[in-house]
Amino acid sequence: MKPDAFIDELWSYAAEVPMEQHPWFDGIVKHRWTKEQIILGEVQHYLRVRTNPIFFGHMAINAVSAKEYTVMETVLENFMEELGGKRTHVDIMLQFLEEGGITREQADNAEPAPGTLAAIEMIIGCCQRRSALEGVAM
């Protein structure tokens, strides 16, 4: 499948369930989660987000190795969106956690839940061993 067709297919999946219908966000909006539960969930989110540079490194290597220069541009755009500029995804996560009373040190020392650890390992494995485009899709 051509990269553009694959990207279109992926966006069609993303459009099937609007973000506000995701169980996590739905629970926040409908006040099913307590403040403490939200903070604990966001600590887990932080533990995953802080590994984004690892994912992007593997994707960049795979794109260049395969001479997929348009995919490399997409990887670079994603990298800059996540890690460039004045406020990175990690910065935003840390601000949220600090407002909830969690320091960076506490977040960094938190134990990943089994699902968080599995997600991190799955994404790293995909980004290492699959195409750069499949890594971006993760």
Residue ranges and their predicted role:
Residues 26-33, 67, 129-130:
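Short, charged low-complexity linear motifs
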Residues 7, 28, 38-39, 54, ...:
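Weak global preference for isoleucine
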Residues 12, 70-138:
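Active-site-proximal alpha-helical scaffolds that flank and shape metal-associated catalytic sites
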Residues 1-25:
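Acidic, low-complexity proline/glycine-rich segments
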Residues 21-28, 56-57, 108-110:
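Short coil/turn segments at secondary-structure boundaries
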Residues 13-19, 32-65, 81-85, 135-138:
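Alpha-helical bundle segments that constitute or directly flank the non-heme di-iron/ferroxidase center
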Residues 1-5, 34, 131:
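Alpha-helix capping and helix-coil boundary motifs
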Residues 6, 25, 55-56, 79, ...:
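Phenylalanine-focused residue identity feature
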